[in-house]
C-alpha cells in the first residue's frame, strides 16, 4: 500500500481553519520512512486562531442546546466512518508518523472504542442528578452540568489521531466546541479525523484545526480557550499550566514518563519477554506509557535478559504498509539524536548493549534498532531522563521490595507494568506503585483500553485524567440548583424570629440523625 495521494492531501488541506489557504506560507511534510516530501501544510497565525474561536463560540451556543442524545448520534456516526475508512487512516498514520502498521491499528482501535464509550455513557453522565437538600422534604437540590464553552486541545505527534480526536470527543458530547492545534509534523492525521466528524454531521465551526507553531498557534489557543487539554513534555506542560492558572481556566495534561516494569520470581519469562517487546517498542518507543526501566529479581535476571534479548534481536524493522513489520521509524532527526545520544552516553560510561544499539540508515533515514541495555548507572542520561525511543534498561534487584523502591524513585508516575507468579501477587505489587496506571501481566494496553476508568499521571507525568466519567465531566461546569419548598430559612408561619432562631439548631441536629446523614 502506498502513502496517500496528492489528491487526498489537497482535499484535507482545505479543511484547516485558515482563510486563503493557497496564499499562506507552508511547511513541508515528509514521508517519515523515506524522508521524501509528501505534501505541504499552510502555517496558521494567531489571527486564524482568534477567528476560529469567534466562529466556534457562535456555533457552540446552538450545539449546547441540542439534546445530548443527538450529540451522541453524531459521535456514533463518526465511529462507523472510522471503521469504514480504517485502511486509509492507517496508511496516513504510517506515512506521516512512521509507525509499523500494527501500531497504527492501535490508534484506530482506540478511536472506535473511545467514540463508542462516550456515545454510550454521555446521556447518563450529563443528566441532572439529585443531591441531598438542606432540609429533606422541604428543599430540593439538583446538580446540572453545563459545557465549558470552547475547549483548546494541543496534541502531539506520537499518537496524532488518538491524542487529537479522542480527547475532543468527550468535550464535544458535553456540548463544547473545540479548537485544536495538531503537531506540525502530523497535521493531516488530525485533519483526516476532522473530515470524518464533519461527514458524521458535526458542524465544521465546532471543531477547528489550526496548524502552526506552538509559540504562535498554541499560545493563542491558551489565550482564548475556556479549558485547555495538552499532551506533551512535562516542561511545556508546566508552562501551559502556569498560563492557564493566570487565566483561571481549567487545565488537564498527560506529560512525560519513565515507566517501570517489575518482573518477580514465578513469572512466566517466555510470556514476559514476548510481551515486553511490545511494551517497550510500540511506535519505536515513542509512547508516553511505554516501558523504559525493567527491574528483575536477581535469581531470574540472567534468564530473562537472555530471553528478552533474543526476542528483541528477532524483531523486524521496515517500511512496509502492511502487517509484516514489528517496528517502524523514529519521527525526526531530533528524536534520532536523543536516542543515539542516550545510548552512546551509556556505553561510554560502561553500559552493556544486549541487543540493538545503532541507527539503521539502510532501512530509512530515521530508523534505530530496538535496544536493550544492562549495567546502567545513575549518572547515565538514560537512567533517569525519558528517552522516548526504542531503548530500555534492565536492572537486577534483590527482591520485590527493592524493585518497588527503585520503580518509585522518580519524579514521574504515568504507567507501570508488573509480572509475578500469580495475579494476586501482581496486584499486591501494583498497589504499592506510585503511578496513574499499573498493568498486571500486560505492558500498557489493558489500562489504556479500560475506557471506563481514569487514565493519567502522578507527579511530573500530568494533571487531571482522560477516560472514564472524569474524562467527560472535566469539560463541564457543575451547577447546583437548590429550591426551597414550603418555606425557606426565614421564620415561617408568623413564628417570632427569636423563637425560630432558637429552634434552628435542634432542627439541624435532628436532620443529622436521619438515615443517610451520619
UniProtKB/Swiss-Prot annotation:
| Annotated family | Belongs to the aldehyde dehydrogenase family.
Superkingdom, according to UniProt? Bacteria
- The UniProt record lists the EC number as 1.2.1.79
Q: Which GO terms describe its molecular function?
A: succinate-semialdehyde dehydrogenase (NADP+) activity; succinate-semialdehyde dehydrogenase [NAD(P)+] activity
Q: Does the keyword Repeat apply?
A: no
The entry's cellular-component GO terms read: plasma membrane
Q: Which InterPro entries match?
A: Ald_DH/histidinol_DH (IPR016161), Ald_DH_C (IPR016163), Ald_DH_CS_GLU (IPR029510), Ald_DH_N (IPR016162), Aldehyde_DH_dom (IPR015590)
Q: Which UniProt keywords apply?
A: NADP, Oxidoreductase
User: Which residues does UniProt mark as catalytic?
Assistant: 254 (proton acceptor), 288 (nucleophile)
Name of the protein in its database record: Putative succinate-semialdehyde dehydrogenase [NADP(+)] 2
GO biological process assignments: tricarboxylic acid cycle
Q: Does the keyword Oxidoreductase apply?
A: yes
What reaction does this enzyme carry out catalytically? succinate semialdehyde + NADP(+) + H2O = succinate + NADPH + 2 H(+)
Job description of the protein = Catalyzes the NADP(+)-dependent oxidation of succinate semialdehyde to succinate. Although it has succinate semialdehyde dehydrogenase activity, is likely to act physiologically on a different aldehyde(s). NAD(+) can substitute for NADP(+), but enzymatic activity is three times reduced.
Q: Which residues bind NADP(+)?
A: 157-158, 181-184, 232-233, 255, 386
Q: Which PROSITE patterns match?
A: ALDEHYDE_DEHYDR_GLU
Primary gene name:
gabD2
Q: Which NCBIfam families match?
A: PRK09407.1
Amino acid at each position: 500500500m502506498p502513502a496517500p495521494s496528492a489528491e487526498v492531501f489537497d482535499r484535507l488541506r482545505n479543511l484547516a481553519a485558515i482563510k486563503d489557504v493557497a496564499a499562506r506560507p507552508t511547511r513541508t511534510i515528509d514521508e517519515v520512512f523515506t524522508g521524501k516530501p509528501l505534501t505541504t501544510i499552510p502555517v496558521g497565525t494567531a489571527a486564524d486562531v482568534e477567528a476560529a474561536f469567534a466562529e466556534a463560540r457562535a456555533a457552540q451556543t446552538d450545539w449546547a442546546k441540542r439534546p445530548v442524545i443527538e450529540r451522541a448520534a453524531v459521535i456514533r456516526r463518526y465511529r462507523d466512518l472510522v471503521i469504514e475508512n480504517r485502511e486509509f487512516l492507517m496508511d496516513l498514520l504510517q506515512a506521516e508518523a512512521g509507525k509499523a502498521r500494527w501500531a497504527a491499528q492501535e490508534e484506530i482501535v482506540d478511536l472506535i472504542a473511545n467514540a463508542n464509550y462516550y456515545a454510550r455513557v454521555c446521556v447518563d453522565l450529563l443528566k441532572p442528578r439529585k443531591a441531598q437538600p438542606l432540609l429533606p422534604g422541604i428543599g430540593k437540590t439538583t446538580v446540572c452540568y453545563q459545557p465549558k464553552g470552547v475547549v483548546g486541545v494541543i496534541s502531539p505527534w506520537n499518537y496524532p489521531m488518538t491524542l487529537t480526536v479522542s480527547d475532543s470527543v468527550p468535550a464535544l458530547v458535553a456540548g463544547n466546541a473545540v479548537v485544536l492545534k495538531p503537531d506540525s509534523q502530523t497535521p493531516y492525521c488530525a485533519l483526516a479525523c476532522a473530515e470524518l466528524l464533519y461527514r458524521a454531521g458535526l458542524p465544521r465551526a465546532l471543531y477547528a484545526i489550526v496548524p502552526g507553531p506552538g509559540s504562535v498557534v498554541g499560545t493563542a489557543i491558551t489565550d482564548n480557550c475556556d479549558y485547555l487539554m495538552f499532551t506533551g513534555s512535562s516542561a511545556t506542560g508546566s508552562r501551559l499550566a502556569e498560563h492557564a492558572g493566570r487565566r483561571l481556566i481549567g487545565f488537564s495534561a498527560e506529560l512525560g514518563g519513565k515507566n517501570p516494569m517489575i518482573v518477580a520470581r514465578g513469572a512466566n519469562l517466555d510470556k514476559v519477554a514476548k510481551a515486553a517487546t511490545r511494551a517497550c517498542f510500540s511506535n519505536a518507543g515513542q509512547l508516553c506509557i511505554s516501558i523504559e526501566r525493567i527491574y528483575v529479581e536477581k535469581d531470574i535476571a540472567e534468564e530473562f535478559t537472555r530471553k528478552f534479548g533474543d526476542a528483541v534481536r528477532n524483531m523486524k524493522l521496515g517500511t512496509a504498509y502492511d502487517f509484516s513489520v514489528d517496528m517502524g521509524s523514529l519521527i525526526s532527526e531530533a528524536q534520532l539524536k536523543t536516542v543515539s545520544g542516550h545510548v552512546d552516553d551509556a556505553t561510554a560510561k560502561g553500559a552493556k548493549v544486549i541487543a540493538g544499539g545503532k541507527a539503521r540508515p539502510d532501512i530509512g533515514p530515521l530508523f534505530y534498532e530496538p535496544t536493550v541495555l544492562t549495567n546502567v548507572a545513575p549518572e547515565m542520561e538514560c537512567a533517569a531522563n525519558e528517552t522516548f525511543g526504542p531503548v530500555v534498561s534492565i536492572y537486577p534487584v534483590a527482591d520485590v521490595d527493592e524493585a518497588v523502591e527503585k520503580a518509585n524513585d522518580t519524579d514521574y508516575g504515568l504507567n507501570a507494568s508488573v509480572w509475578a507468579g500469580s495475579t494476586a501477587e501482581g496486584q499486591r505489587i501494583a498497589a504499592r506503585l506510585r503511578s496513574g496506571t499499573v498493568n498486571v501481566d500486560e505492558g500498557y494496553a489493558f489500562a489504556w483500553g479500560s475506557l471506563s476508568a481514569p487514565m493519567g499521571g502522578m507527579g511530573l507525568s500530568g494533571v487531571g485524567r482522560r477516560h472514564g466519567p472524569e474524562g467527560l465531566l472535566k469539560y463541564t461546569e457543575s451547577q447546583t440548583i437548590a429550591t426551597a419548598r414550603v418555606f425557606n430559612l426565614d421564620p415561617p408561619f408568623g413564628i417570632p424570629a427569636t423563637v425560630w432562631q432558637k429552634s434552628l439548631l435542634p432542627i439541624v441536629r435532628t436532620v443529622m440523625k436521619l438515615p443517610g446523614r451520619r
